[in-house]
């Protein structure tokens, strides 16, 4: 079992943790999140980005992690970036707690997300269905108020 965590923080009040667990290279990864301080009653995009670099804040993380050269999509789509995690839903206080399993996100192997950045976005991910070029790259999820590098957890 490999476990990893991204401690989420940034230039906003958004913070929290996103954890990853994978039993072996052939099993889905469980992704769990506990995010606070976001917009109330909203769906907000979150993605694994290419680089584990936060030198200039979350913008240094680069584009979505996309080792297979696909266009942006929903987590359940065949055509999607590895880093496309979709949206989480916040409650009336702007907090979100949840989990999902993902067959493309890996902690083990050549396409591992370890050392890359988990970015929480300011907007809703349109899952590549926005009808414009930016939708096929980013899901029009907007600015990056908070992020954290995915590191090995105890």
From Swiss-Prot:
GO CC annotation: cytoplasm
InterPro entries for the chain: SOD-like_Cu/Zn_dom_sf, SOD_Cu/Zn_/chaperone, SOD_Cu/Zn_BS, SOD_Cu_Zn_dom
Pfam families, sorted: Sod_Cu (PF00080)
Residues spanning the membrane: none
Main location: cytoplasm
Binding-site residues for Zn(2+), renumbered to this chain: 64, 72, 81, 84
pH dependence: Retains over 90% of its activity between pH 5.6 and 7.0. Retains 85% of its activity at pH 4.0 and 60% of its activity at pH 12.0.
Subcellular location: Cytoplasm
Catalytic activity field: 2 superoxide + 2 H(+) = H2O2 + O2
Disulfide bridge partners, by residue number: 58-147
CDD domains: Cu-Zn_Superoxide_Dismutase
Region (Disordered): 125-147
Domain of life: Eukaryota
Top EC group: oxidoreductase
Function description: Destroys radicals which are normally produced within the cells and which are toxic to biological systems.
Subunit structure comment from the entry: Homodimer.
Full protein name: Superoxide dismutase [Cu-Zn]
Lineage: Eukaryota, Fungi, Dikarya, Ascomycota, Pezizomycotina
């Amino acid at each position: 079992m490999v476990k990893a965590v991204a401690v989420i923080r940034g230039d906003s009040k958004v913070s929290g943790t996103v954890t990853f667990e994978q039993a072996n290279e052939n099993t889905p990864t469980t992704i769990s999140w506990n995010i606070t301080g976001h917009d109330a009653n909203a769906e907000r995009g979150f993605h694994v980005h290419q680089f584990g670099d936060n030198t200039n804040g979350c913008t240094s993380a680069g584009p979505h992690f996309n080792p297979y050269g696909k266009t942006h999509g929903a987590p359940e789509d065949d055509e999607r970036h590895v880093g496309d995690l979709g949206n989480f839903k916040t409650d009336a206080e702007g907090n979100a707690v949840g989990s999902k399993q993902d067959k493309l996100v890996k902690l083990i192997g050549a396409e591992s997300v370890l050392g890359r950045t988990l970015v929480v976005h300011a907007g809703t991910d349109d899952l590549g269905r926005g009808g414009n070029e930016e939708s096929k790259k980013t899901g029009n999820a907007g600015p990056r108020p908070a992020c954290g590098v995915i590191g090995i957890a105890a």
